[in-house]
Amino acid sequence: MSDNDQWLGAAVQRRGADVKATTKDGDTVFTCIIFLLGETVGGDKEEGRMINRFCFRVTQLLMAHGADPSECPAHESLTHICLKSFKLHFPLLRFLLESGASYNCSLHGPSCWSGFHIVFERLCSHLSSSEDDSFSADLLQKAETVLELMVASSQIPKLPSDFDINSTSCRFQGEKIKALFYSLKQLQHSPQALKHLCRVYIRQRLKPWPVDVKIKALPLPDRLKWYLLIDHGNSGEEDI
């Protein structure tokens, strides 16, 4: 997983390799990346960082050549995998969302799989089993950032028609999760505020990643920059 490997991949694509091709077994260009990300769980930390950097750079290259990380089936979707493990793969997920990847199935929409549903499902699952305050705070902060990234990528959030949560299953932080959920539902059913539409438009124009770095460089008042930014303390770039 050296720079030479990435150079070779870039050279192959420049010679016409099809990033949308699949093998006879149904493997896609993201199959190996998903496998490698799985190898980072519970392994050596330094090796995990090296794998994550490699997966990030290759994903960046593939998306630049038109690869879609949000196609179904879900187990072959890099976006779906990152959403399910949003705490672990947060930097890569942020890159995907800021680079135009759909937070729902890009072929069939939210009725197939939905980023909002996955995040709330994983949030409730993790917070039902952990009383660790620092873990809960970090998980909630990352979940809020992911939800905000998804909201800021479309004028109206695309939710499944039957989208709901069972807050009673969340033993800890249930009220905070309900507040997040209801604010999202309200955004879906209310007329969109002009400032939200402007935020979506500006962030779309600044894609791809890193959008927040580009916002900070704009000749705008600090108050406006603050509204445009997501996760004010971190652009995500330093985590790669």
Model-derived features with residue positions:
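Ankyrin repeat boundary/linker residues
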Residues: T23, P73, L107-G109
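Ankyrin repeat domain, specifically the short helix-to-loop turn at the C-terminus of the second helix
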Residues: A10-D18, F56-D68, R94-S102, V151-Q155
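Cullin-RING E3 adaptor/co-adaptor recruitment helices
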Residues: R49, I81-I240
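Start-of-repeat signature of ankyrin repeats
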Residues: G26, H75-E76, C112
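Cross-kingdom leucine-rich repeat
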Residues: M1, T28-T31, K45, L61-L62, ...
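Ankyrin repeat A-helix N-terminal signature
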Residues: M1-N4, C32-F54, H80-H89, R122-L123
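Alpha-solenoid repeat scaffolds
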Residues: V19, G26, L36-G43, P69, ...
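Solenoidal tandem-repeat scaffolds enriched in leucines and small polar residues
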Residues: R15, T23, L36-L37, V41-R49, ...
